[in-house]
A protein has these predicted regions:
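Chitinase-like catalytic core of GlcNAc-active glycosidases
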Residues: 17-252, 257-263, 272-285
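Cleavable N-terminal signal peptides of Sec/SRP-targeted secreted and luminal proteins
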Residues: 2-18
Length: 285
């Protein structure tokens, strides 16, 4: 009975606090600036994507599409925008990987080297060549969609050992367990896990919410994470499949998951495709 009361209280607290909205920014020059993205007041977390090359001794490459060219030091001006976002209470993370890139980790030492690079160049460390300028980011997002899944657990561990809080997030595909990120997620070090419930018919919304809710409740709710997010495309054009109309999301799906203990909110791909979707769902998130 005591355990039941505790669980009930935690559910009540979760409902009262409400969820958050995370969004990916950086892959389309027409999506507006980072500062403008934060100024919409629609997002609590912004993932800057992507660091598309890293590991295996490669020189890391930051790809921000049409926004700026990091290779010629044109992205350091984003530091002021990052600072402005953080001043509004918005967490800003750097996303590793993405759907296209050349990235892999070949050993535990390789993972530690990548962690040190991230710390020195994007987090609380020091480097003469910080691609986004001097303002430190809040954390690192793992959007690993290519290569193998080895040693990402070691990367998560190394990022957690710098003596300063580094928020960690992961963006696995919804088929469970994720073939590349499950080992890292199982470390229990991730603050946020935003599962991509799209482009995967067996566990996405396809006119019916059954598969999605079964995946959420039976699979993903069992993982060791602080907060679990529902990852969705922000428009029908944002993904091949899995878009959920805002009215369906707010009336059928969010009421079924917001009371679950690990519910954290909704993640959207991406800012470019978000033409009012986040604003329309925000009151229900």
């Amino acid at each position: 009975m005591a355990l039941f009361k505790i669980l009930l209280l935690l559910s009540f607290i979760n409902i009262c606090v409400g969820g958050e909205i995370a969004v990916y920014w950086g892959q389309n020059g027409d999506e507006g600036s980072l500062g403008d993205t934060c100024a919409t007041n629609n997002y609590n977390i912004v993932n800057i994507g992507f660091l598309t090359v890293f590991g295996n001794g490669q020189t890391p490459v930051l790809n921000l599409a049409g926004h700026c060219d990091a290779a010629s030091n044109q992205c350091s001006g984003l530091s002021d925008e990052i600072r402005a976002c953080k001043s509004q209470g918005i967490k800003v993370l750097l996303s590793l990987g993405g759907a296209a890139g050349s990235y892999t980790l070949t050993s535990a030492d390789d993972a530690k080297n990548v962690a040190q690079y991230l710390w020195d160049n994007f987090l609380g460390g020091q480097s003469p060549s910080r691609p986004l300028g001097d303002e430190s980011l809040d954390g690192i997002d793992f959007d690993i969609e290519a290569g193998g899944g080895e040693f990402y657990d070691e990367l998560a561990k190394a990022l957690s050992e710098f003596g300063q809080k580094v928020y960690l997030s992961a963006a696995p595909q919804c088929p469970f367990p994720d073939q590349r990120l499950q080992g890292a997620i199982n470390t229990g070090l991730f603050d946020y896990v935003w599962v991509q419930f799209y482009n995967n018919p067996p566990c996405q919304y396809s006119g019916d919410a059954t598969n999605l809710l079964n995946s959420w409740n039976n699979d993903w709710s069992t993982i060791p994470t602080g907060k679990l997010f529902l990852g969705l495309p922000a428009s029908p054009e944002a993904a091949g499949s899995g878009f959920i109309p805002a009215d369906v999301l707010t009336s059928q799906i969010l009421p079924a998951i917001t009371a679950t203990l690990k519910y954290g909110g909704v993640m959207l791909w991406s800012k470019f495709y978000d033409n009012g979707y986040s604003a329309s769902i925000k009151p229900a998130v």
